[in-house]
Amino acid sequence: MKTLKVGLCGAGNVGRAVLRTLIQSSQLLEVQGGVHFDIVQVGARRGKEVVPYEGINITTNLEDVATNPDVDVLVEVIGGVNFAYELVTTALKEGKHVVTANKALIASHGNELFTLAKENNVDIGFEASVAGGTPVIKALREGLVATKVKWFAGILNGTSNFILTEMESNQSTFESALKKAQELGLAESDPSLDINGTDAAQKASILAALAFHVPFDFSLVSFEGIEEIELEDLGYAKELGYSIKHIAHGELENNVVCVSAYPTLVDNETLLSQVGKEMNALEIFSEGIGSTVYYGPGAGPEPTASAVIADLVDIAKGGWDLDINSDDQNKLEVLDRKRAARYYRLQVNDEPGVIAKISSLFGDQNISIEALIQHEAKSKENLESISVVIISGEISNNEAVKLKNALEDLPEVFSGVKKFRIHAGEK
């Protein structure tokens, strides 16, 4: 039986879950994985206080683990970027494999880390960096290796999905839904990276590198968060047959790759629209197969630990020969020419001719109107206004922004115009 000597850096919730699983499920891992794991050393800044197991070599100096000659593979679950980068590069230069759950690290430094790993004939496992315990990276690395991926779309941040589910299902305000997520441990005390779209965008960057064989380049990922979504938008979307989800999306067309993470209207007949609470899901569309969907818990100590240990088993069995940037024909670009239908919500004066004027503006810009609904104002402050919601035809990002600005310039329109993408689905 293969023995793998493990050094663990990080003893927070995820680190302790990894350690607990390796110890308590050792027999199961030997039977099902064919691997015996020897925990050589654990790096924890608070030492024995957070590692309640006897007989384990614990150090408060995490660099010791990265340089320990008895360690075969370093597991990095400390989070952050700078110090994690130092630890991982040290371990790779020492000829050690690395397993990480750190999406920010991979999205920011993936190119140089994989180059360094290749130079030292070692592997990097990063399944836990995207979608927690749902094996989406393994699907791209192995299950879909014989197909050409055309696009992917998914819900990759459990915090934002929980908030939107609460708002839609219980008519909760954004603030109360966020507070509930924090009370349940589904959101950090500072949830900014989750709600402003950064977390999902980092994950989308990683998936794009695997799906389309382009370099990691987080700077070319376009993204927005969910802060601007209001209960009105969720209600109007439902009336039109949609749900609003925060969708990470990547697409390859004519050798150009565009990657994004945006609030998006999703047809209620699709599987992604049914993904609720803190769950994650990813739909991958590839030639010859069509759509495959992966669903499961996207975060939490146990799902993340499961993904980490799956990578450890794969490394013990020989790892992967992974060349991320293997297709020089494909080019990653900022999302500007990707065409999609758009949702616009305007608050306008309740007077004759307003709808005709808005329709004329769409016509002037050669943009079709696919659907239009209007309602009386929902607040006492705006009794002399009406809400108008318009679904446009497919337009580029530049056209969508230009149209939004033109609508806001109309004297009959007041307050900001809301604009969201619409996911087209299979094609």
Where is each model-derived feature located?
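N-terminal glycine-/serine-/threonine-rich beta1-alpha1-beta2 phosphate-ribose binding loop
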Residues: 1-94
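A short hydrophobic/small-residue beta-strand
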Residues: 97-99, 369
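General beta-strand structural signal in soluble alpha/beta enzymes
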Residues: 58-60, 75-76, 99-101, 124-128, ...
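Rossmann-fold NAD(P)-binding glycine/threonine-rich loop
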Residues: 84-90, 103-141
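Catalytic, metal-anchored helix/loop core of enzyme active sites in primary metabolism
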Residues: 57, 149-153, 161-164, 168, ...
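Oxidoreductase and adenylate-handling cofactor-binding alpha/beta cores
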Residues: 136-149, 160-172, 202-216, 311
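A conserved regulatory-domain signal marking ACT and ACT-like small-molecule sensing domains
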Residues: 312-427
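Substrate-binding/catalytic subdomain of NAD(P)-dependent oxidoreductase enzymes
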Residues: 176-274, 279-281
